[in-house]
Amino acid sequence: MCPWCIIGWLKFEKVMAHFEGRLAFRVQWHPFELNPDMPPEGEDAAAHVMRKYGISADQSRANSGRLADIARELGFAFNRGPEFRMRNSFDAHRLLTWAGALEEPEQAAATGVQTALKLALFRAHFTDNRDVSDHAVLADVAASVGLDRVRAAAILAGDDYGEMVRVEEAYWADQNVTGVPAFILGGRMMVPGAQDPDMFIRVIESKVLAAAA
């Protein structure tokens, strides 16, 4: 899971609050694996970052500290101790795809079960340091947001929604999404990165609202 995704979401919540009463937001979370080849046992997070980005241990610690500071200012806790590991997220994406399929089209982002599950997964991984590739953990997290634990466990035990995840990942790759977070506004405009709220507000006002006028 990408730490910048939760930071990006927390910033975007401020954008939705800014437009309250003017725009109704519907948020869908789409699958994107930063590390699709991550082994079942995961990988030490510091070692992974140093290997993947070619940086030193000091740089890795500095980056982690910066992320933690930004998240703290937004009300989210990163507890990335020395035991913190990167995890394979494919099965989490399968559950998220299931949760998205359960939502009614008119459901709001802030109350949708898919968003609730995504945020619970962020907390489980980054705050509680739980193994979000473990099926028992994933079933617990699903149940914590009101989803059926038995159905979640059955999905995880099989391959349900796996093909849907792969197809959607391929689609977004074809749309030139190469990293996350990536926000698709109005189904047609991509804004990459965890941008500040003011930037999103300008884009929505000048592009999305103007196009709808």
Predicted regions and their residues:
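Structural alpha/beta surface segment adjacent to cysteine/selenocysteine redox centers
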Residues: 9-125
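Short, cysteine/histidine-rich loop/knuckle motifs that typically chelate Zn2+
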Residues: 4
